[in-house]
A protein has these predicted regions:
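A generic hydrophobic-helix recognition signal that picks specific residues
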Residues: 20, 89-90
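N-terminal amphipathic alpha-helix/helix-capping segment at the start of soluble metabolic enzymes
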Residues: 1-24
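Short, glycine/acidic-enriched capping/hinge loops at junctions between secondary-structure elements
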Residues: 35-39, 60-63
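Acidic (Asp/Glu)-rich catalytic clusters
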Residues: 14-15, 38-45, 73-89
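Conserved small/polar residues in nucleotide/adenosyl-binding loops
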Residues: 93-95
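Conserved active-site and cofactor/substrate-binding residues in soluble primary-metabolism enzymes
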Residues: 3-8, 28-32, 70-74
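Glycine-rich, proline-tolerant flexible connector loops at the mouths of alpha/beta enzymes
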Residues: 25, 30, 48-70
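A common structural microfeature
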Residues: 23, 34-37, 45-49
Length: 95
């Protein structure tokens, strides 16, 4: 499924609050950790949340560049492309 829109993400959070449960939130710092998180969500049959920390985003831009904005944009673009291949809803959080 594609990355959840803000409306779908709010529905996910409302469902969790109503059902007294939490979605797993995985900190992503590379395409490999993103794929691992998506696979884990799908294997568990659980929707989930991916989040990019400042340090993770810096790392994703390149170890000598350390541009958190570019790294976060790159990870987000990649997430949008690959998430549609998984059968779970993915919310995104900004840390």
């Amino acid at each position: 499924m594609p990355i959840a829109s803000p409306e779908i993400y709010n529905e996910m959070l409302d469902r969790a609050k109503k059902g007294a449960f939490a979605y797993p939130a995985i900190n992503v710092s590379s395409s490999q950790t993103l794929i691992a998180a998506l696979r884990g969500f799908e294997e568990a049959g659980s929707d989930g949340i991916i989040q990019f920390s400042w340090g993770g985003a810096e790392y994703a831009s390149g170890s000598t560049i350390k541009n958190a904005v570019d790294g976060a944009v790159a990870l987000a673009e990649f997430a949008h492309v690959v998430a549609k291949n998984y059968k779970v809803k993915i919310g995104r959080a900004h840390v």
